Amino acid sequence: MMYLHKAPHRAWWPSPEKFAEFYEKEFPEPATLFDDYSGRGTAAKTAEMNILTHMQYMHDSKVRPETIKVMGKVEPEIVYVRGDGSLMYPTAQGFYGPFGRANNEQKKKYDVTLDKISQDFKENWPNMNDKEKMQWKFQRYMQDYLATISSVDDNVGRVLNSLDAKKIADNTIVVYTSDQGFYLGEH
């Protein structure tokens, strides 16, 4: 039997309960969070790994599209360059696509935390300097990413508990595989 989880890659939408729980947590910043990659090769300088300039407000940080619209232009503007040189701007679909998969009960639970995120963003973002913006986005990233990881951990635990309960754990081989995961702001 194979049992597979969605890798905890974008979009990070943990359960509404984990979303609320981890939103209240604050995570330590890695020493390399503000690295500007000066003196490094082209690959390191051009990789889309900068939390401030590459993580999207709606898709990654879960700021409601309506909040972005009311605020007008939000700095820094997030723009991606496609392989053909054309520009790609994030859209509200990055938020509504994943959110739209939730049922009504889940959406009501998500709404409580989403309202807090959007209100905090609207009130504080315009007065933040770039360092504070990076710190804000880093916390949002860690909260969502680690909540997603925690959800995977919980469900792997459920499988292992089920194997024990059915008394087949000793006759079962469990193999864990993964990719390298996402950087947690460090490198």
Ranges and model annotations:
Residues 1:
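Glycine-rich ThDP/TPP pyrophosphate-binding loop and its adjacent helix/strand module
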Residues 4-170, 175-187:
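Active-site-proximal cap/lid insertion segments
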